[in-house]
Curated annotation (Swiss-Prot):
The lineage of its organism: Bacteria, Pseudomonadati, Pseudomonadota, Alphaproteobacteria, Rhodobacterales. Interacts with CtaA. The gene is ctaB. It is found in: Cell inner membrane. This is Protoheme IX farnesyltransferase. One of its GO terms (biological process) is heme O biosynthetic process. InterPro entries: Protohaem_IX_farnesylTrfase, UbiA_prenyltransferase, UbiA_prenylTrfase_CS, UbiA_sf. It catalyses: heme b + (2E,6E)-farnesyl diphosphate + H2O = Fe(II)-heme o + diphosphate. Converts heme B (protoheme IX) to heme O by substitution of the vinyl group on carbon 2 of heme B porphyrin ring with a hydroxyethyl farnesyl side group. Carbon 2 of the heme B porphyrin ring is defined according to the Fischer nomenclature. The chain crosses the membrane at residues 26-46, 47-67, 95-115, 118-138, 147-167, 174-194, 220-240, 243-263, 281-301.
Length: 310
């Protein structure tokens, strides 16, 4: 009797697969925060310049995603959450992801510099380098503080948007950077609480893997305690106002409540309800950031009518 083995042949890559390399979900957050940074800056920007600037910031974010998928293909193949990405699934070859990432990086940086200013282009270039090299190639696989330090990569977009409009930085753009930077650890650690097995199987030293869930819960609370007053203080900057203050107080009250609940939970309780509280906190943290930046944008939109700001 002859054994017949059927080998599944990877399908041919389509446009959607190459687009997925750019991490469109992450790109949407980058575009939104960069757009807010650009629109609330105290400078008048021609609509075409603004549109072009956001386009190339988005392209730079996508380039970072493609480079990350190229480098992380080995661990993405192990993790349930990422194994169906184009490279680990065998649909897109690693070299294609690398080539696309490098090409888009060059186009994004050069064109942003030509369309806006060199400072914004330099900041975009540094952001791509920080995410692709400092975070992906170094921090992610070597330290449980990977997302703490690496979180800077995701915090730069509003600064880049601000730089497109003004050609520099300010207290307000630094505040937006700090808001995302301090939000990143509790956001990803809440994910790691219910995805610990994925990270341990892939050999990624997330805090849950190196120090356990109990310590991670304490860190979520600690960062929430640092994030909340920072977020509320933004109401008293040049981009804040009463509307932002109300939104920030409500969101950060909910943030602290959720962080305390996570800190108090024991593993038996969490396993019994399949980490429902942790999953809820993770979902809330996504709305948390969008709503803060939405409130900042609303304050700027109301100012011409004498309603925004103090």
């Amino acid at each position: 009797m002859t054994d017949i083995r059927i080998t599944e042949v990877p399908r041919e890559a389509g446009f959607g697969d190459y687009f997925a390399l750019l991490k469109p979900r992450v790109m949407s957050l980058v575009v939104f925060t960069a757009l807010v940074g650009l629109l609330v800056a105290p400078a008048t920007v021609h609509p075409m310049i603004a549109l072009t600037g956001i386009l190339f910031i988005a392209l730079g974010a996508g380039a970072s995603g493609a480079l990350n998928m190229w480098w992380d293909a080995d661990i993405d193949r192990v993790m349930k959450r990422t194994r169906n990405r184009p490279v680990p699934a065998g649909v897109v070859q690693p070299g294609e992801a690398l080539g696309l990432g490098l090409a888009l990086s060059g186009i994004a940086v050069v064109m942003l510099g030509l369309a806006t200013n060199l400072f914004a282009a330099g900041l975009l270039a540094f952001t791509i380098f920080f995410y692709a090299v400092v975070y992906s190639m170094w921090l992610k696989r070597t330290t449980p503080q990977n997302i703490v330090i690496g979180g800077a990569a995701g915090a730069f977009p509003p600064m880049i948007g601000w730089a497109v409009a003004t050609g520099g930085v300010s207290l307000e753009s630094l505040f937006m950077f700090a808001l995302i930077f301090m939000w990143t650890p509790p956001h990803f650690w809440s994910l790691a609480l219910f995805m610990k097995t994925d990270y341990s199987d892939a050999g990624v030293p997330m805090l849950t893997v190196t120090h356990g869930r109990r310590v991670t819960r304490g860190h979520v609370l600690a960062y929430a305690l640092l994030l909340a007053p920072l977020a509320v203080a933004g109401a008293f900057t040049g981009i804040g106002g009463p509307l932002y203050l109300v939104v920030a107080l409500a969101l950060n009250g909910w943030l602290l409540r959720g962080a305390v609940r996570i800190w108090r939970r024991d593993e038996a309780e969490a396993e019994a309800d399949r980490y429902r509280t942790e999953k809820g906190f993770f979902r809330f943290s996504l709305y948390y950031l969008f709503l803060h930046f939405g409130a900042i944008l609303a304050e700027a939109a109301l100012k011409p009518y004498g309603l925004g700001g103090w």
